[in-house]
Amino acid sequence: MQRTLVVYNIYVARDENSKKAYLLEEDFTNFLTDLSKQSIVDRKKNCAQEHKILYLDSFEHQKEEHILNVRMRSARYASRRNVIDTETMKSRGILKRENDGDEETNHLGLKFIDEENILVLFESNYYGIGFGRIVHYWESF
């Protein structure tokens, strides 16, 4: 399966109330820690219009390097197709239930560069979930 790496450079909006990127690193790590303590059902979000669910699978914080590695999972459901045995060409029928999903994984690497810049390396794939959906997922908690 083809995967594409996309780079985002996020600039922290600066005003007298803005946090520095390193403080954002600590806050975001704490957020992911709290989120990962929830049951998988509680941290799952449904993207009904796309027939997908999305959830935080895991993350790793490399504190000395100011790097967060995040693994998100998604699953597309409501897609039920007839399955055939490609050797015998006999139909095996529909093997999935309506709620069964095809699981995909997206990885993100976040590097907190300095007080104002966060570099994000996002692994994109056609069947996975987009970066905007992941940001929306985080904002929903």
Locate each region found by the language model:
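Intrinsically disordered, low-complexity polar/charged tails and linkers
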Residues: 1-109, 124
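Glycine-rich, often proline-containing surface loops adjacent to acidic residues and nearby aromatics
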Residues: 111-123
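A short acidic, glycine/proline-enriched capping/turn motif at secondary-structure boundaries
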Residues: 77-79, 115, 127-129
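A short alpha->loop->secondary-structure connector
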Residues: 117, 128-141
